[in-house]
Structure formats: structure tokens, C-alpha cells
């Protein structure tokens, strides 16, 4: 879980656009965030297993 201060700092618009970075909308994790969904791989996996992400299913080959 990310510190609350970092999450609040991330929500504010940065002075320069290059300073912007992605964070998970659920847990605040800064790494391995899927841009399409806006959540990290860990939260994505949990939601996918629950069936809460439409059109997403486990790969099998």
C-alpha cells in the first residue's frame, strides 16, 4: 500500500507534464500499471478472477 501523502501528491497536477506518472487507482502502486485499465497487475489479476473486468478471461493454449 502506498503512503497516503504520496497518493495525495500524485493527484495534484504537476508543474511540468513530464513529471506525471501512472499509479494504480485502487492501491496506489506506482509500478506495473496497465494504462488501459489504470490499475496495477496485482489488482487486475484479482478483479479478473472475480469476473469484474468485462471481456477479460484467463489465457489458455
From Swiss-Prot:
Cofactor note text: Binds 1 zinc ion per subunit.
GO BP terms, alphabetized: translation
Pfam families per the UniProt record, alphabetical: Ribosomal_S14
Family membership noted in the UniProt record: Belongs to the universal ribosomal protein uS14 family. Zinc-binding uS14 subfamily.
HAMAP family, A to Z: Ribosomal_uS14_2_B (MF_01364_B)
Subunit: Part of the 30S ribosomal subunit. Contacts proteins S3 and S10.
Protein name from the UniProt record: Small ribosomal subunit protein uS14
Gene name, Swiss-Prot/TrEMBL: rpsZ
Amino acid at each position: 500500500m502506498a503512503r497516503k501523502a504520496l497518493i495525495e501528491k500524485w493527484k495534484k497536477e504537476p508543474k511540468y507534464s513530464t513529471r506525471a506518472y501512472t499509479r494504480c487507482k485502487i492501491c496506489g502502486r506506482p509500478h506495473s500499471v496497465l494504462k488501459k485499465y489504470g490499475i496495477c497487475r496485482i489488482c487486475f489479476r484479482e478483479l479478473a478472477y472475480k469476473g469484474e473486468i468485462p471481456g477479460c478471461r484467463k489465457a489458455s493454449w
